[in-house]
């Protein structure tokens, strides 16, 4: 049986490749998804790769992962990282490994990006690896997935 990992992407990540490429690079979300699918396959994992601009939809995806007992969650909450108590609470309910991921090093950016509400309930935090962080997170989570 293949372990399923949810990769959840928050607001504005559908604009990868267009939005601030000097920070986020030129790779589109579709290109990133394809790289993640390829990496997951090589690791013997199955992924469900999602993006939404809506807080409630992201929270419902975490609830779904919890209810289905998926192997792990990799989440880039984007701007919701710093504002969403509800997302933080949803992540507390998921008992498997959880990685908070950011493409840029949020700690080198403006102060508004320094205080994550999502970091407390997750297992690990990755930031500053560019989109390669997603591939590294898949490698890390493989050995810890339930």
Features from the language model and the residues they span:
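Short beta->alpha junction loops
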Residues: 48-56
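Mid-chain, well-packed structural core segment of small domains
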Residues: 70-106
């Amino acid at each position: 049986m293949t372990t399923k990992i949810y990769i959840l992407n928050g607001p504005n990540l559908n604009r990868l490749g267009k939005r601030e490429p000097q920070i986020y690079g030129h790779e589109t979300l579709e290109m990133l998804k394809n790289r993640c699918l390829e990496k997951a396959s090589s690791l013997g994992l199955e992924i469900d790769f999602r993006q939404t601009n809506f807080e409630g939809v992201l929270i419902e995806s975490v609830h779904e992962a919890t209810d289905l007992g998926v192997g792990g969650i990799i989440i880039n909450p984007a701007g919701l990282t710093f504002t969403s108590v509800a997302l933080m609470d949803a992540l507390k309910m998921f008992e498997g490994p959880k990685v908070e991921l950011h493409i840029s090093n949020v700690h080198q950016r403006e102060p508004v990006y320094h205080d994550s509400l999502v970091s407390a309930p997750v297992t690990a935090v990755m930031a500053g690896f560019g989109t390669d962080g997603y591939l590294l997170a898949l490698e890390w989570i493989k050995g810890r997935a339930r």
